[in-house]
Amino acid sequence: DDVLGFAYEDVKRAFKYFIEHYNQDRPFVIASHSQGTHHAIPLLKEMIDTSELRERMVAAYLIGGIVLPVTHDSLSSMENISACEDAEQLHWVVHWDTMAAGASTDLFGVDRPVDSLCTNPLSWQTNEELVTAEKNAGAVFPEGIYNAAIGKGEDASTAQVFEALPAPLQR
């Protein structure tokens, strides 16, 4: 908890810096994944939910909070921010876990106590109704200077072997 708390304080400081130095009172989107999702929930509650920032937050895409699931209950402590249930809704949370249907939820030796909220990004509903692939308008594929072909050329990952590191603090 201390480590996650320390990491959250860093996220909060970075968000404050962004708002004060770069945002210029413009709308913004919160986007997180995995551990970042766990930090985004308290950020929404502490910094955005009851402040003027809420009106500027277009949406919060909190993706992949598998170990500590994002649920309606985890959002219920907020006064003005809730789960998206309509494609035209603003100032809401969209969440889904990034795992295949039928995959085990027993991750890292931790069994999740409740099911996650799931906002289907094709229907914008939080029910379990399947939406067929025909409803997907497609994807935007990078072209030109935006197509870096990451991992396919000189930047392809290779195995690395590291020597043991000394203790960070010497007594």
Predicted segments with their positions:
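Phosphate/oxyanion-binding active-site loops and adjacent basic polyanion-contact surfaces
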Residues: 3-11
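Gly/Ala-rich beta-loop-alpha elbow adjacent to hydrolase catalytic centers
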Residues: 30-40
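Short acidic, glycine/Ser/Thr-rich loop/turn "cap" segments at secondary-structure junctions
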Residues: 1-3, 24-29
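Surface cap/lid and interfacial helix-loop subdomains adjacent to catalytic sites
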Residues: 10-25, 45-171
